[in-house]
Amino acid sequence: MRRSRVPGAGLASWTEIDTGPIPGGGALRLVRRDEEFLIAVDGMELMGSHRSGSERELADLACGALRDHPAPRVLIGGLGMGFTLRAALAVLGPQARVVVAELVPAVVAWARGPLAHVFAGCLDDPRVEIREADVNRVIQSGPETWDAILLDVDNGPHSLVSRANDRLYDSWGLKRARWSLRPGGLLGVWSGCPDRQFKARLQRTGFAVTEHRIRSERPGRTPHV
C-alpha cells in the first residue's frame, strides 16, 4: 500500500467510483483517473493500481521460503488491490491454502466489480478463501494454524485508517501472531518506513527479525519496509 497525500490537485482531479464505510467510523473512497485507480481515506492515498512493488515483495519474501512446503497455510491481512495475493499465488504450490481477511466489505465488492481487471481472476483461484473479517480475530482463532502471516493492514505499525489496527502491532498482537504460527512460521509486515521501536517489539516477542528496504516507486519517497 501507499500512504501519502494525493499529489497535484489532490482528489479533485479524480472521479469518484464508490465509497465504503469503515467499521468503527470513516469511509474509504475508490477513485479513478484515466486507467489508474486509487483507494483513499481523508485525502490520503492508501493504495494505487499503478504502484505495487512493495506489496509483491512482501509475498515474494515470505512465500518464497515456503516454496518447497507441500501444503502451506498462509493468512494475508488486507486485500487491497490484490497485489500481495497474486504474488503469493504465483509462488505457492497447488496444495496451498491462502486466506485473505479484509475488514471493509466494499473492498471485496470492488475487487469483484470495478477492479476486477486488476485482480485478474485471482479471487477465483481454488486455493483462495476471502473472509470479510478483522484479521486480528482470524489470528486468534487457533494456535499453530499458519505457516505464514502477511500483514499489509492500514499504514503498518502506524495506523491511518483506524486506531483499532494498532492492536495487530502492539506487544499483545505480536504475541498472538506468534501463537498462531506453526513452528518455523513466518510473519511478514509491510511498513511505510523503518521503525526501530516496532523492530524491538518483534525481537522481545521472540521473532528473529530481518528488515528489507524496498525502493518506493515514487522518486524521493522513503523506502518501504
Model-assigned labels for residue ranges:
Residues M1, R5-G10, D42-E45, R97-A101, ...:
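A generic short-segment signal for beta-strand/edge and adjacent turn/coil regions
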Residues M1-V41, M47:
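N-terminal auxiliary segments of SAM/dcSAM-dependent transferases
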Residues P7-E16, G20-P23, C193-V225:
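Active-site capping/gating segments
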Residues G24, F37, L46, W110, ...:
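Bulky hydrophobic/aromatic packing residues
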Residues V31-R67:
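Active-site-flanking structural segment that lines cofactor/substrate pockets
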Residues G48, G82, R196:
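Loop/helix-junction capping segments adjacent to catalytic residues or to phosphate/diphosphate-binding pockets
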Residues S52-L181, V189-G192, T205, T210-S216, ...:
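The AdoMet/dcAdoMet-binding core of the Class I SAM-like
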Residues G185:
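Glycine-centered, phosphate/nucleic-acid-interacting loop/turn motifs that mediate DNA/RNA or nucleotide
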